[in-house]
């Protein structure tokens, strides 16, 4: 079975006191652009922009202050911190895990009605909708085991 130990659970989010304002990293290929000729994804960042994060079963997604482009969808969203302060203490070392996957851009639709028509305008908010990694872990758990190679 594929390991899920780097995927953030509710317990991880609570233990490390992940909260709005925390910076996250996102890997993706905005408009198909690559970081270099070797084809690596582009690393960008944003801050958690919604509350609450848990319980993930209830919230399902969270918002990241991050402008989404075509090619970002499906990209991993990573938490990475060195010497993080939580539970009132500085914890020396690196904390890293996968928070989720980019789903879409958050937008609001404005409806303007007149006597003869209704016009809808979509307003981009430069916010990414992130699917919690707990749902990725659930998917992985449904996969069949990887067959063992035979000599």
Indicate residue ranges for each PLM-predicted region:
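Short glycine/Trp-rich loop-beta-loop segment that forms part of the substrate-binding cleft
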Residues: 6-35
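Conserved catalytic-core segment of clan PA serine endopeptidases
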Residues: 1-2
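Short beta->alpha transition motifs characteristic of CBS
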Residues: 28, 98-109
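Gly/Ser-enriched beta-turn/beta-hairpin loop segments
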Residues: 36-42, 51-60
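Catalytic nucleophile loop of clan PA
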Residues: 66-101
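PDZ/PDZ-like groove recognition
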Residues: 111-151
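Terminal peptide-recognition signature
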Residues: 21, 48, 73-77, 132
């Amino acid at each position: 079975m594929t390991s899920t130990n780097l995927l953030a659970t509710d317990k991880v989010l609570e233990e490390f006191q992940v909260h709005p304002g925390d910076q996250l990293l996102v890997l993706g290929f905005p408009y198909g652009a690559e970081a270099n000729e070797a084809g690596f994804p582009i690393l960008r960042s944003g801050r958690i922009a919604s509350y609450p994060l848990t319980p993930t079963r209830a919230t399902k997604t969270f918002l990241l202050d991050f402008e989404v482009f075509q090619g970002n969808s499906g990209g991993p969203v990573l938490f990475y911190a060195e010497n993080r302060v939580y539970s009132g203490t500085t914890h020396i070392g690196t904390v890293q895990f996968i928070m989720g996957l980019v789903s879409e851009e958050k937008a609001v639709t404005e409806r303007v009605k007149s006597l003869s028509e209704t016009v809808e305008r979509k307003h981009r908010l430069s916010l990414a909708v992130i699917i919690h990694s707990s749902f990725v872990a659930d998917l992985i758990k449904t996969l069949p085991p990887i067959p063992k190679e035979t000599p």
